[in-house]
A protein has these predicted regions:
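Outer-membrane beta-barrel "beta-signal"
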Residues: 111-116, 198, 242-263
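Detector for outer-membrane/organellar transmembrane beta-barrel domains
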Residues: 151-217
């Protein structure tokens, strides 16, 4: 517990908008878990992350730290789509990988993720939370032309998950508090999901460019922070998965519909 408290204090100490956390998988979310928040209509995000191997879903495929990069677009006010590439090294003693590729980043796993916001926060009822559904990496075939939406085999679909999420924000004297709950499901054998995830985030009143995050992602307890600079165009992400494994990311955000603040 002391370790978690010290880390939160460090995150605050480093940082003496309206930024949302950027999930390490490329969608708007917390750290690992998806939530029901949505970027503004017309927002485009380009980003990348350093991912500790414990942050990756398949230990046989990623037994090493890696990186990803992604493109994220929000349109029609309620739909968000991301395209994510995660770097892969050639593995020794696998026929698929020539010896000259061993332990080198020579390939990448590609997948799509999407989220639809069914209900906006405060819509229909002032206490209504936002509600969203979505999917990450819905296909699993390494060849052929079929799509297995259950992704119950080991081939590809490494990041597969379906989800339904709810988010509610509260304005407190301390700052803006977000409470998030998400049900996650897949049929993966190497990374099964069929559980609830919970998270909170706090944007302190004294410094709203800072976003402190804690979550249980249905597997581990993670803590981290997002820091927004240059009017929310750049966002820096820092995470401790399970309180000890470091991942970090950087995103650039711009809105194609205008209204960008460049000061």
């Amino acid at each position: 517990m002391k370790h978690y408290i010290y880390t939160l204090l460090i995150c605050i100490g480093l940082s003496i908008g309206n930024s949302y956390a950027q999930l390490t998988d490329g969608l708007t979310g917390l750290l690992h878990m998806q939530n029901a928040e949505m970027q503004k209509d017309g927002t485009v995000i380009i980003g990348g992350n350093y991912l500790n191997k414990h942050n990756l879903p398949n230990n046989n495929w990623w037994e090493y730290d890696s990186f990803n990069y992604f493109l994220n677009i929000t349109f029609l006010d309620r739909i968000e789509i991301a395209y994510i590439c995660t770097l892969v090294k050639g593995q020794p003693n696998f026929n698929y990988w020539p010896e000259q590729t061993w332990n080198k980043f020579v390939n990448q796993d590609r997948h799509f993720a999407a989220k639809i916001q069914l209900v906006k926060e405060g819509e229909w009822w002032k206490h209504m939370p936002s509600i969203a559904i979505g999917v990450s990496d819905p296909t699993t075939a390494s060849g052929g032309d079929y799509t297995d939406f259950n992704a119950s085999v080991h081939n590809n679909g490494f990041f597969n998950r379906w989800f339904i999420a709810m988010t509610k924000h509260f304005n407190l004297p301390l700052g803006e508090l977000g409470i998030h709950a998400t049900y996650l499901y897949n049929k993966r054998k190497d990374y099964p999901l069929n559980d609830l995830a919970f998270g909170i985030n706090l944007k302190p009143a004294f410094h709203k460019n800072l976003n402190l995050i804690a979550e249980y992602d249905a597997k581990t307890i993670n803590i981290g922070a997002l820091y927004s600079i240059w009017a929310d165009h750049f966002n820096l992400l820092f995470e401790l998965q399970d309180g000890k494994y470091i991942s970090a990311g950087l995103t650039y955000k711009v809105n194609l519909n205008g209204g960008n603040n460049w000061k």
